[in-house]
Amino acid sequence: MSMTDLLSAEDIKKAIGAFTAADSFDHKKFFQMVGLKKKSADDVKKVFHILDKDKSGFIEEDELGSILKGFSSDARDLSAKETKTLMAAGDKDGDGKIGVEEFSTLVAES
């Protein structure tokens, strides 16, 4: 399954384009722009599993840094600052990684 099976390619392209400048990434705006906020809980979980590149059941910091590439291969990596901000927002239990429920909460709070 690819991201475009779940989300509009046009919405993804617009959202990626909105955050091309370094340190401009805003996960709340991004999740809204790609249409993730409007998706069912099942679809949000499917997106999580696409972003969980190593299939560990968690999105770790290195995967988080390349989260935009999970939506579009030609997107940029997040800066260290953006990655840490996103991890702080999503890692509710403080274990240094984001689980599927934490990701679902992160999207719901967008």
Curated annotation (Swiss-Prot):
Gene Ontology MF terms in the entry: calcium ion binding; identical protein binding; protein-containing complex binding
Pfam families: EF-hand_7
Single GO BP term: gene expression
Effect of substituting R76A: No effect in the overall structure of the protein
GO annotations of cellular component type: axon; cuticular plate; cytoplasm; neuronal cell body; protein-containing complex; stereocilium; terminal bouton
Keyword field contains Phosphoprotein: yes
Modified sites of kind N-acetylserine: S2
Keyword terms, alphabetized: Acetylation, Calcium, Metal-binding, Muscle protein, Phosphoprotein, Repeat
Role noted for this protein: In muscle, parvalbumin is thought to be involved in relaxation after contraction. It binds two calcium ions.
Free-text comment on this protein's domains from its UniProt entry: AB domain, comprising of helices A and B, is involved in structural stabilization, protecting the hydrophobic core of the protein. It is required for high-affinity binding of Ca(2+) and for Mg(2+)-binding.
Protein name, as recorded: Parvalbumin alpha
